[in-house]
Amino acid sequence: MAALSFSPSPPPKENPKENPNPGIKTTLKPFGKITVHNVLSESGANALQQHIANQNTIIRKIRDFGMLGAVQSAAASTTNTTPISSQRKRPLGESQKQNRHNQQNQQLSKTSVPAKKCKTNKKLAVERPPKAGTISHPHKSQSDQSFGTPGRKGLPLPQAVARRNARERNRVKQVNNGFALLREKIPEEVSEAFEAQGAGRGASKKLSKVETLRMAVEYIRSLEKLLGFDFPPLNSQGNSSGSGDDSFMFIKDEFDCLDEHFDDSLSNYEMDEQQTVQQTLSEDMLNPPQASDLLPSLTTLNGLQYIRIPGTNTYQLLTTDLLGDLSHEQKLEETAASGQLSRSPVPQKVVRSPCSSPVSPVASTELLLQTQTCATPLQQQVIKQEYVSTNISSSSNAQTSPQQQQQVQNLGSSPILPAFYDQEPVSFYDNVVLPGFKKEFSDILQQDQPNNTTAGCLSDESMIDAIDWWEAHAPKSNGACTNLSV
């Protein structure tokens, strides 16, 4: 086992050659004042302990060579990490080299740390321009940046701080320029009066910002009194003039009144145009359109066209006579220069007629229901056709057979033919149907029978024959009933 003891006496000079047992492998490691001996056998350790009578010697027994290598590596690591330097003697040349190296390190550390300068030296350095021949050393600038705080001792500021300082300087400059401009706008008499009111102030001293603002307020109030503006008080104290939006509106109204006498032609034109627009809008609001005016003047229902009587909500069946009267009236309106003719599309004689069609209301309703499928619904257009003269109609009417007369009586209820009549020859329609229809319809309208209640309508026999013929020729319809009342 190894024994560890400390003694103040210095260690003796040991010589490995004095070992009496040269066959035993031993290693000596100076470790301060303690000497460690590694031996491989117990007998060798006993012999070494007998010959070395030193209390500062440590004997370590190692069983094999592998353990010996591990112990040596551990001892080497402890000697490298320990802060205690070895106390061996060095030659004179080696010690001189070490001293020189230490002095060089101290000089470098002194040059890297900037020395404090007095204020006079700093001012001189700022006033003196830099020499052109000076060359900046990058290693020195890096060392200067590494020490000290930014903004002190001539070091650069961060970018954000520099921008903030520049904005603040710009703001202060703008405020000062604004106050200087305000002082220039105020008359000298007002500024001299304010300077005279200042107690203990020199005449050459500039007015402060607060005094400048007060002077501007008083000057504005004096201008208001001079112009005759009488502003209502904004609070209970009853100030002579107010400020803010109310005072601005009063000033605007007053100046608008002054500018009315100096309007140019363009402004007058714009005002006249606005007045006309306002008058038209007011008239439209005072006279709203009636419900009857909003109704269409011409409508189509189940293939039959109806025209509205002006000023009423009733519709009248459009016939050939009405078409002729309308075309004649349109020609008169085109030729008339004064424009004082009647603009009503319906003649008075048609309005006075007790029946709008030569067929009774019941029969006309049945005919409309039957022609619902074959006629085109909601066809808002007037079909204009050319008709032959009355002489041809009278001659052709004498030649027609009784069956053709029944067809003519049936067709008198509608000026528009159903769809299946398009398949008939054109000559039959032009030469037979239309002339007879026109003659009979004109005769019925011209009859003046005040005692007869069925004036202007067909007889019962002719009506029954017309219905029978219509049922035989018209296709059947399953459409629902429709109301013609408006």
From Swiss-Prot:
What GO terms fall under cellular component here? Answer: nucleus; RNA polymerase II transcription regulator complex
Coiled coil segments of this chain: none
Keyword list (alphabetical) reads: Developmental protein, Differentiation, DNA-binding, Neurogenesis
Which InterPro entries does the UniProt record give?
bHLH_dom, HLH_DNA-bd_sf, MASH1/Ascl1a-like
One Pfam family name is HLH
Molecular-function GO term, any one: DNA binding
Its tissue distribution reads: L(1)SC, SC and AC strongly label the presumptive stomatogastric nervous system, while ASE is more prominent in the presumptive procephalic lobe.
Q: Where does the bHLH domain lie? A: 159-223
Q: Where is the composition biased (Polar residues)?
A: 75-86
Domain of life of the native organism? Eukaryota
Annotated region Disordered: where? 1-26, 75-158
Describe the task this protein carries out.
Involved in the determination of the neuronal precursors of optic lobes in the central nervous system.
Instruction: Relate the assembly described in the record.
Output: Efficient DNA binding requires dimerization with another bHLH protein.
What this protein is called in its record is Achaete-scute complex protein T8
Organism annotation: Drosophila melanogaster
